């Protein structure tokens, strides 16, 4: 057995000993060096302006109703309690103006910002269509607000997940995935 392992390690080391190919470097119009990687948009700079993110899935394009429905089904399958929250555009992101600070330490809630709860948490909800109808009602009542769906685990007494289900049409702080890099 030891000799077989020894032979494999020798073979691996011979394969790894091959010299790496150096990338072809060319100069672009401005005189900067470019490689194949930069031409393929693999080495890009993150756009720091108007590119704010929220919780889970915020790096993706806005979720469709079907995708939200699948997430709701997953939440209900795991016996978690869904809850809708909404916030105005100026209160949606964490900041000194809208965070509750308790002395030198922050509160223990997720990211120190509290959104307004839409009705009560949906305790005992077993049908995903109920959650989707509440999302539609909240969107109709507050069309220019951010709306997120969070879910809580009653056994562990923690928030399990949270993601946006509605971004206001007037939001200018979001970029499509193709525009997030320079």
Swiss-Prot record:
SUPFAM superfamilies, sorted: RuBisCO, small subunit (SSF55239)
Subunit structure of this chain's protein: Heterohexadecamer of 8 large and 8 small subunits.
HAMAP family: RuBisCO_S_bact
CDD domains linked: RuBisCO_small
Other observations noted: The basic functional RuBisCO is composed of a large chain homodimer in a 'head-to-tail' conformation. In form I RuBisCO this homodimer is arranged in a barrel-like tetramer with the small subunits forming a tetrameric 'cap' on each end of the 'barrel'.
GO molecular function: monooxygenase activity; ribulose-bisphosphate carboxylase activity
Organelle targeting peptide span: 1-42
GO BP: photorespiration; reductive pentose-phosphate cycle
Keyword Chloroplast: yes
Superkingdom, taxonomy of origin: Eukaryota
GO CC, any one term: chloroplast
UniProt keyword annotations, A-Z: Calvin cycle, Carbon dioxide fixation, Chloroplast, Lyase, Monooxygenase, Oxidoreductase, Photorespiration, Photosynthesis, Plastid, Transit peptide
Major localization listed first in the record, in broad terms: plastid
UniProt name for this protein: Ribulose bisphosphate carboxylase small subunit, chloroplastic 1
Role, per record: RuBisCO catalyzes two reactions: the carboxylation of D-ribulose 1,5-bisphosphate, the primary event in carbon dioxide fixation, as well as the oxidative fragmentation of the pentose substrate. Both reactions occur simultaneously and in competition at the same active site. Although the small subunit is not catalytic it is essential for maximal activity.
Cell compartments where the protein resides: Plastid, Chloroplast
């Amino acid at each position: 057995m030891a000799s077989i392992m020894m032979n494999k390690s020798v073979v691996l080391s011979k394969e790894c000993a091959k010299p790496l190919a150096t990338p072809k470097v060319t100069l672009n119009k401005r005189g900067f060096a470019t490689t194949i990687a930069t031409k393929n948009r693999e080495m890009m700079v993150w756009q720091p302006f108007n590119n704010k993110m929220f919780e889970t899935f915020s790096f993706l394009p806005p979720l469709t109703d079907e995708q939200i429905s699948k997430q709701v089904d997953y939440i209900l399958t795991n016996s978690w309690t869904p809850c809708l929250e909404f916030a105005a555009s100026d209160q949606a992101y964490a900041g000194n103006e809208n965070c509750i600070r308790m002395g030198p330490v922050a509160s223990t809630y997720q990211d120190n910002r509290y959104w307004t709860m839409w009705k009560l948490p949906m305790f005992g909800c077993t049908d995903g269509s109920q959650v989707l109808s509440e999302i539609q009602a909240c969107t109709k009542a507050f069309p220019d607000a951010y709306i997120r769906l969070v879910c809580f685990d009653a056994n562990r007494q923690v928030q399990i997940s949270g993601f946006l289900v509605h971004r206001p049409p007037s939001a200018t702080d979001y970029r499509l995935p193709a525009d997030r890099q320079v």
